[in-house]
Amino acid sequence: MTDKKPTIEPGWNFDNSYTTLPKSFFSRLNPPPVRSPKLAILNERLAKSLGLNVEALQSEEVIAMLAGNKTPEGAMPLAQAYAGHQFGHFTMLGDGRALLLGEQITPTGERFDIQLKGSGRTPYSRGGDGRAALGPMLREYIISEAMHGLGIPTTRSLAVVTTGESVYRESELPGAILTRVAASHIRVGTFQFAARFCSIEDLRALADYTLQRHFPEIETEENRYLLLLKGVIQRQAALIAKWQLVGFIHGVMNTDNMAISGETIDYGPCAFMDTYDPATVFSSIDVQGRYAYGNQPYIAVWNLSRFAESLLPLLHENEAQAVKIAEDVLAEFSKLYHSNWLTGMRAKLGLFNEEEQDEALIEGLLNMMKEHRADYTNTFRALTLNQPEETVLFGTSEFTEWHEQWKARLTRQPEDTDAVQQGMKKNNPAVIPRNHRVEEALEAAWKEGDYTVMERLLTVLSDPYAYTPEQVEYTTLPAESARPYQTFCGT
C-alpha cells in the first residue's frame, strides 16, 4: 500500500549544486528514521518566502520529511565535510548530526540550503549519537529568529519536529530535529579541510563554487581569489560590528562556526549581554574567556587569518608572495570593523553627521556603563525615549556631564528632536531575547508542552524596534538570583 500524497503540494523546488563539488567534500546518505515525528513549531512567514505551502507543511507526510523519515522529491541528502580550530586547536570535523537535504530555489530565484539538524549519525559523528534535544533546538529557533528581527545576517529556523524518542545527555531528554535555512553552510572550516586534506584542484573547485554562489559579481575576475578573501573579510567586519552593537555574544567562534556567506551560524552557547562588560562570557566551556564579548572582533580576524592561509595556493604560486598578499588584506579588517562599529554607535546616539570627538563621547558612555553595571540595551532605550532617569547612571556627576555634552552635540546637526528620536528607535532595540525570558519560554515548551509563552516571545522579538506597550514587560532585567547566567553547548 502506497502512502497518500498530501492534497496540496508542499512546494519543494530542490537543486543540489553542492554535489557538483569533488566527492571528498561530502558523504551521501539518508537519515535513520525516528519513531513518532510531530510538528512542534513552524515558521509560517519564512515558509511562504521560500515558496512553501504552510498547510502542506503541517501534513503527516511533510512532517515525516522534516524528521528525515522520507526524502522530499528532488532532495539528495548529504553530510558536509569540514575541519576547524575549536578553541584554537585544529581538528577534523564535519556534519556529525546534520544533513543537507538540498537547496530550495525560491519563487524569486534565491537559493537557500535546507538542513536537518539532529537527524542522526553520519560518517563525521566522532562517537556522538547524531541526535539533538528539544530544548536546544527551540533555543536556536528563538535566537536565530530574534537575530533576523534585529536585522543581523543569520541562518533561519523553518521548523522544529519532535521525534518521539529520547536523547541522553546529563539526563533523559525529548529528541527533536531543527530545519535550518541558510544562504549556504560553507564555512572557514570547509576551506581549512580542502587546504589540509584535498588537492589544490579540489581547493580551487571549492573557491570557484563559493564565488559562483556568494560573489557572482567577481567570479570571472582575474584576481577573483584575492577578491573572495576581501569580500569575506568585508562581510565579517560588518557582521561582527552588528553583533557588538546589540550586545550579542556568540560563545563558540570556532572557525567551523564562521560562515563564508557572512551569516551568523551555529547558535550553541550564545546569549545577549545584560550588564555592559566587555569581559562577559556565558558559555560554561569557555573558562579562559577566549570568546568574550570584547574579544569577538579579535577572534574574527584570527579566524579570517586561517581562511587566508587556506587560500594561499590560489593567491600566488610563490608562497612568500601569497603570504604578503594575504597579510595586506587581513590588515584591512580592523579599519573595516571599526568603521562599521563607529557608524552604528553614532546611529545609536542619534548622530547623523560626523565629528572627531564622537568616539570619545561613545567611549565615555560605555565606560560609565561598565563602572556602574548598567544594562546595555536599556541604557540606549532610555536615551532613545528621552528618559535618562530610567538608567542607573542617572544622578551621577559624570553622567550629568556626559548627558550635557551629548545634548550639545545633537544641536550641532540640522536634524530636529523628532528626527533624532526616530533615528535612534531604528538602531536601539526596545527588546532583545533576554536569557531569563528565553529560559522561561523553553521551560514551558519542552517540559509542559505549552508553546504560548514561546510564541508570544517570538512575536515581540520579530519587531524589536517597534517600541510598543506589549514590549515593556520584556525589558525587565533578570532577578539577581538568575545571575550569573550560563549557557551550554546543547545545539
Curated annotation (Swiss-Prot):
Molecular function in Gene Ontology: AMPylase activity; ATP binding; magnesium ion binding
Enzyme class: transferase
Positions annotated as active site in the UniProt record: 256 (proton acceptor)
Domain of life according to the entry: Bacteria
Binding residues for Mg(2+): 257, 266
Keyword vocabulary terms for this entry: ATP-binding, Magnesium, Manganese, Metal-binding, Nucleotide-binding, Nucleotidyltransferase, Transferase
Annotated catalysed reactions: L-seryl-[protein] + ATP = 3-O-(5'-adenylyl)-L-seryl-[protein] + diphosphate; L-threonyl-[protein] + ATP = 3-O-(5'-adenylyl)-L-threonyl-[protein] + diphosphate; L-tyrosyl-[protein] + ATP = O-(5'-adenylyl)-L-tyrosyl-[protein] + diphosphate; L-histidyl-[protein] + UTP = N(tele)-(5'-uridylyl)-L-histidyl-[protein] + diphosphate
Cofactor requirement: Mg(2+); Mn(2+)
The enzyme's E.C. designation: 2.7.7.-, 2.7.7.108
Binding site for ATP: 94, 96-97, 117, 129-130, 180, 187, 266
Family designation: Belongs to the SELO family.
HAMAP family: YdiU_SelO
Role, per record: Nucleotidyltransferase involved in the post-translational modification of proteins. It can catalyze the addition of adenosine monophosphate (AMP) or uridine monophosphate (UMP) to a protein, resulting in modifications known as AMPylation and UMPylation.
Name of the protein this chain belongs to: Protein nucleotidyltransferase YdiU
Taxon lineage: Bacteria, Bacillati, Bacillota, Bacilli, Bacillales
